[in-house]
């Protein structure tokens, strides 16, 4: 059996960790966070008094927030977030653009689904059902 390659690098993980720390700090939050295993389909969990309260999917982009009118994410991430919502765990998508950071609640929204994805890696599994989230729906954390 051939396994799909892992594309996340240690540099990616450092950027994602920094983004989560900035996000928590922006709320003057006294919460901890932990990296989640891959089977959870989210990157981190936020922990308040040893209780998991939120799962966070983090994306660090190399473009400005205004470069596109929507943000695309794998439908499987949104489906997973709705499942977690059923057991009381909120899920957010946190995006660090080059000029701003924003987040959106993944559990309580309905967005357009289309076929899309990236083509630069030559991986046929990168083309899949994706969800288009309007950039206007993101809550802005602040300038970075």
Q: Where are the regions a protein language model picked out?
A:
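Acidic-basic catalytic patches of nuclease active cores, encompassing PD-(D/E)XK
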Residues: 1-36
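A structural signal for short, well-ordered beta-strand segments and their strand-loop junctions
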Residues: 34-35, 55-57, 92-96
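Beta-rich catalytic cores
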Residues: 40
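Conserved catalytic cores of phosphodiester-cleaving nucleases, focusing on short active-site segments
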Residues: 44-64
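Mg2+/Mn2+-dependent nuclease catalytic core
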Residues: 61-84
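Nucleic-acid nuclease catalytic cores
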Residues: 82-110
């Amino acid at each position: 059996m051939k396994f799909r390659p892992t594309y996340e690098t240690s540099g990616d993980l450092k950027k994602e960790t920094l983004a989560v720390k900035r996000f928590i700090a922006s709320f003057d939050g006294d919460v901890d966070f932990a990296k989640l295993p891959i089977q959870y389909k989210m990157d981190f969990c936020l922990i308040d008094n040893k209780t998991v309260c939120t799962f966070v999917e983090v994306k660090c982009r190399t473009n400005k927030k205004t470069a596109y009118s929507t943000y695309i994410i794998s439908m499987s991430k949104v489906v997973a977030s709705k499942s977690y919502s059923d057991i009381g765990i909120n899920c957010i998508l946190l995006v660090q653009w080059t000029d701003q950071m924003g987040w959106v609640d993944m559990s309580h929204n309905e967005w357009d689904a289309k076929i899309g994805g990236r083509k630069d890696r030559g991986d046929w599994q990168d083309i899949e059902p994706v969800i288009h989230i309007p950039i206007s729906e993101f809550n802005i954390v602040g300038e970075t």
